[in-house]
Amino acid sequence: MGKTTQKGHRQKSFYRGVRAEKWAAWWLRCKGFHIAEIRFKTKCGEIDLIARRGNLVLIVEVKARSTLAEAMAAVSRVNERRIEAAADIWLARQKDRALLCVRFDLIAILPWRWPQHIPAFFMSNK
């Protein structure tokens, strides 16, 4: 693959991810969640979506794949640790952090299907 082709592929993947995150955010809003952050970036990693409903905080990884199995397999243990570290930074900035219940979810965006929301996709080691 040449430089132009690699750049084009990365750019296409980036915009596909942005569209998937917007679709997932819409889905969570339909479920009554407030979107607190989109693409929350830290030096430790990035969280695709942070959503709140009352004291429940969802830390959401969004994956656009052909199948649910591919989306689930795309989140490695290393990814989980990075997401956890970024979540710790976000939570430390919340005044009501002691009251919050945090859950790590996955939303899979699949072709021609409604988003697939997998609650508690992984658990924190803390």
Swiss-Prot record:
Gene3D superfamilies xref list: 3.40.1350.10
GO MF, one annotated term: nucleic acid binding
InterPro entries: Restrct_endonuc-II-like, tRNA_endonuc-like_dom_sf, UPF0102_YraN-like
Family named by the database record: Belongs to the UPF0102 family.
Protein name listed in UniProt: UPF0102 protein BH12350
Species assigned in the record: Bartonella henselae (strain ATCC 49882 / DSM 28221 / CCUG 30454 / Houston 1) (Rochalimaea henselae)
